[in-house]
Amino acid sequence: MSVNMPQDVDVREFVVPDDETGRRLDHFLAGQTPDWSRSQLQRVIRSGLVMIGERQATKTGEKVEAGDRITLRAEPPEVYAVAEDLPLEILYEDDDLAVVDKPAGMSVHAGAGTKSGTLVNALLFHLTGGLSGVGGQWRPGIVHRLDKMTSGVILVAKNDLAHRRLADQFKSRSVHKRYQVLVHGHVEKDQGRIEAAVGRDPVRRVQMKVGGIAPREAVTLYRVVRRFHHFTLLDAEPQTGRTHQIRVHFASLHHPVVGDRLYGAPGKLRIGPQERATLDRNFLHAAQIEFAHPRTGATMSFTSPLPPRLATFLEFLEKQDR
């Protein structure tokens, strides 16, 4: 089965929050559209495809003001979403939604250089009744995302009503998410709150950073589960949903996520005086999600155990600590 998603105008609308007043238009849009490069955005602006309210914007450096309604219109490339028989564990499914356990190494949806092997491809094969269209041509059914090398529970909408109501819950921060994360070094406080705005790195565009281009509020709560000789195991609860948020927050404290070379984790892990090990993925796992059913309002909660690769790594660390 395949779904041909024809070329069409992709319309995205944003309202400028108070803390973005005075920011350059291209910088603001860069923070809102991580799937676009800044050069692409600048071409779109100069082509007159961006509106501020009812007025056409053509200057990339124009300053935006709180309350401005910005509309971006562009023609995306034609995308074909093809159902693929990929391994996928479905934790729950009904007529409105599904909850699945995404493996590490699987992208959520198509993007630059990735046209197959994604979660969307797997969903089209395994789920009955289709996916919502609100997510657009690239992201049918996708209400929120997990990074490619992050595993765990992810929520999917099967119709537009469910998608909008679930998206509203994410926007109001009423969805509870808990991650298990192993970081380098000893995190001193047993529990804490990291509050640092996150934006795109102006030099390394694939990365985010504290501050950066068009930074947005980002808050992560954490609790120490266990300390090892060289690592700390944590439960992390993001209160906001910024790209790479947990990874960026802990890297900014000099505690990068184990296996996360993009944000400074070493390739070889020190696990003993003379011993080194490697981990072929980030030690970041979406362990739990809790939300209200979009149709009934009932509270729903789903969990995912640590994947065997991560559980085995923890067992190895425990043996080293004895």
Regions found by a protein language model. Give the residues of each.
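RNA pseudouridine synthases
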Residues: 1-202, 283, 306-318
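Pseudouridine synthases involved in rRNA/tRNA modification
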Residues: 1-40, 203, 212-213, 219, ...
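Short histidine-centered loop motifs in beta-beta connectors
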Residues: 54-56, 229, 234-236
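Conserved hydrophobic positions within beta-strands
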Residues: 90, 183, 221-224, 257
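Well-ordered beta-strand positions
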Residues: 91-92, 199, 223-226, 237
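Short beta-strand segments enriched for Tyr within beta-sheet-rich domains
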Residues: 166, 242-250
